């Protein structure tokens, strides 16, 4: 059964994965830009704490990209195409899973409504 914590958590997760995809796109677009520092979005621990606290909702600030502290190359850039590609695949799959879970929850609600 769908509850507000579950819905909030799925919405927050999809927002976080979307922000992560945007950060990855920015990183790949700046792969040859001298002194560019890769961006990353770290929202998973905040989401886990929010769910544990009974909310599941996260503020927009939780999805703000931060600069990566990974070592830089000679030109001062720290974007790794292999790391970004793997992160893009992982994030896409996680977004897809959260989206499917939300769809399933809404389908159950619709079925219950039709039966009553």
Indicate where each model-derived feature is located:
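Amphipathic alpha-helical polymerization modules
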Residues: 1-116
